[in-house]
Amino acid sequence: MTSSSSSSGSPCGACKFLRRKCAKGCVFAPYFCHEQGASHFAAIHKVFGASNASKLLSHLPISDRCEAAITISYEAQARLQDPIYGCVSHIFALQQQVVNLQAELEILKQQAAQSMIFADSPTSENPNSYYGDTTKAPYHHDHQNIYHHHDQTHLVYQTGSSGTVQHGDATESSYHNETSSGMGEFSIYSDLEQHLNTFNQDHLKELQSANFGYISFS
């Protein structure tokens, strides 16, 4: 908006609109050019008045006059477009945009946080990798072992012998030996438990007899 129309001899946009000679040191000359300044100053003149705009710029420091001229021109054009609210409607629209953008930003932050939590969660692992890894699927192998042992036991009972199976499988023979040894250990454990119960009963009888003897002699 800065213009040098006074130095070139042609009037500034404000003086051109007012149809007067642009004097040296015109307060409007640096900010309203000869070509487009007239249309911009027309809105200022209609809303604020030329004298009021001149007084406003004259009371400001030179460093602040450029921003003031831009602000006055913007407010005047906004008032012509919206005579009731003027630039306030633009301010409300910008504030609403800020609120909407903040809400969208908060939603994106929450989605990013949920994505990070889901990425760090162990449930996000591929379930197929669990079943493909032998170290993580003992349950599947245990069932295979149970079915294998069940088949071996069934074959042993079908042969009716304590040796090897007729098909010559060494695993059935070893399993039969392990089963026999397990039965032997179970019988030994039962004998020990029975012997311990007998000992406890005998010891209890001795205590009861001693107690009664103490009472009778007292």
Curated annotation (Swiss-Prot):
Primary role: Involved in lateral root formation. Regulated by the transcriptional activators ARF7 and ARF19.
Any single Gene Ontology cellular-component annotation: nucleus
Domain of life, per lineage: Eukaryota
Coiled coil residues, start to end: none
Induction: By auxin.
The family this protein is said to belong to: Belongs to the LOB domain-containing protein family.
Protein name per the record: LOB domain-containing protein 29
One Pfam family from the record: LOB
BP GO terms, sorted: callus formation; lateral root formation
Domain LOB: 10-112
PROSITE patterns: LOB
Tissues expressed in: Expressed in roots.
